[in-house]
Amino acid sequence: LDEKRVFGTKKPGVQYTSTLSTYAVIFNLKKDQVGILRTDEHYVLPGGEMVQNESDIECLQRKIKEEIGANIEVGCHLGNAADYYYSPRDSQYVRNEGDFYLGKLSRQEEHHNHMFEWMSPNEAIEKLWLDHQKWAVQEGVNVMQTSSLF
């Protein structure tokens, strides 16, 4: 599962801002729906950019708490993937390298500045903005079908 994937097209002569992030593919208890965030601009997986000296797990725990007011139990590593894209919000080109994990919510409080929604994996893949996040949802589906993790 740790095979490196690269999505998007790196445009020649364009300066990219590199970011390292960690994301969670979170299934509901029935394992038939995935939780994704709806921001003002896009649908995205829970998680985000790491801060200095932060581990993948620490990043996920912090971001899930900030974004949806929940604690997360982090499961298996689904893989690492990168995506080249233009961020209209930040007015810059980005190369985002993400590590993706299965996750399970242990407690959810109020929603913060994002809307957390449950939807079928196919609908999530259709709505997610970034291709490496779409890939991760499919990887999560594959793992859930072949193992008893979570």
What are these regions (language model features)?
Residues 100-102, 109-140:
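NUDIX/MutT-family hydrolases
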Residues 1-23:
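Acidic, metal-coordinating catalytic segment for phosphate/diphosphate chemistry
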Residues 29-70:
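Conserved Nudix-box catalytic region and its N-terminal flanking loop in Nudix hydrolases
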Residues 44, 95, 118-119:
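Short aromatic/basic micro-patch
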